[in-house]
Amino acid sequence: MEWSQIFHDITTKHDFKAMHDFLEKEYSTAIVYPDRENIYQAFDLTPFENIKVVILGQDPYHGPNQAHGLAFSVQPNAKFPPSLRNMYKELADDIGCVRQTPHLQDWAREGVLLLNTVLTVRQGEANSHRDIGWETFTDEIIKAVSDYKEHVVFILWGKPAQQKIKLIDTSKHCIIKSVHPSPLSAYRGFFGSKPYSKANTYLESVGKSPINWCESEA
């Protein structure tokens, strides 16, 4: 199974013309993130056959030079967003490595699908592209990973992500969940949750190689 087949199946099942027309107008008349060529970067960097872990985000960062198509990741020269900083703090506490760069392309290439449930946003307007059709698309992506793969780790931070559990066959996949790494909630159970080591422990238990969560050249 490849993304091209999954995309074909989804677009055959659902009509995304209204969303397509909306995005054409938005990209023509407003500043929208990420750049059009990066909307699907999560799928470009993580082929379907390589998926070991799925980390769900919500919508892209809405500031300049941030979003580039991977959930939680920002472009190399951008400031660290607070949630990502907390993710790295937990990573250091969990498995002892310190990451210096704010982009997560190496995770994507390791087999971590960094999937936002909404893939575009207007500059400065969080959630501005919610309910235009992206949720239907990404729900189908989650279901496809659940249906066609085995032994994938789904890391679900916060209530919106955890609402997607209903799309996942929990009998053949691993669910790791906690509150969101946002500063508003991180101290209520994200810190100390050890998602990275838990994911690797599970992957090794089913005969898969672990994720290299530490810094790598990618």
Swiss-Prot record:
CDD domains: UDG-F1-like. It catalyses: Hydrolyzes single-stranded DNA or mismatched double-stranded DNA and polynucleotides, releasing free uracil. One of its GO terms (cellular component) is cytoplasm. InterPro entries: UDG_fam1 (IPR002043), Ura-DNA_Glyclase_AS (IPR018085), Uracil-DNA_glycosylase-like (IPR005122), Uracil-DNA_glycosylase-like_sf (IPR036895). It is an enzyme of class 3 (hydrolase). It is found in: Cytoplasm. The active site is at D59. GO terms for molecular function: uracil DNA N-glycosylase activity. PANTHER family: URACIL-DNA GLYCOSYLASE (PTHR11264:SF0). Belongs to the uracil-DNA glycosylase (UDG) superfamily. UNG family. This is Uracil-DNA glycosylase. It comes from Staphylococcus aureus (strain MRSA252).
